[in-house]
Amino acid sequence: MNQYKLPDLPYDFGALEPHVSGKIMELHHGKHHAGYVKGANATLERLDEARTTEQFDRIPALERALAFHLSGHILHSIFWRNLSPRGGGEPAGELKATLERDFGGLPAFKRQFNEVAASTMGSGWAALVWEPLSSRLLITQIYDHQSNLNQGGVPLLVLDAWEHAYYLQYQNRKADFFGACWNVFNWPDVARRFEAARKLHVDAA
């Protein structure tokens, strides 16, 4: 069975300081993200065991667990590359033009994205996604890692609103953490994902 693996960070733990502390990055990557990878692999093994032994009553709970752990793994894998010590500034080119078209300007996009992150109740994410059916950008608020998703939306930029992403450094000032992330957002990575996502086609007819 193919195993999910924890990706290496594309920079040192302390590379995003002072915006995100090295200690947070070390714990976030090495403990929390690693836990989702381990959980996804373990759940796949339990699903295989349940099928083999015909314990199909176990399937619903295992499917929920897989959605949680695997979505956590995928979102964190995107998140690390959405950040860069050489980040910040503004998007450019077609990405910038499409953000302006779909949100009425970069300031409005930034305010909406921050509000979606800040208003997350409990644990969740803010995500900029490409919606291929209407060929437009949307911002979605994800509950935990896997709920309240727009089906078919391709995540381009994600922001972790779980307490483990910021509490050691920012305590209850999560809005300050969200603001700090704009200094390290990796717009070339977002643009690369945007160009790839625009090639997708959804046949809904």
Q: Model-derived features: where do they sit?
A:
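Feature for soluble, non-membrane regions of globular proteins
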Residues: 1-205
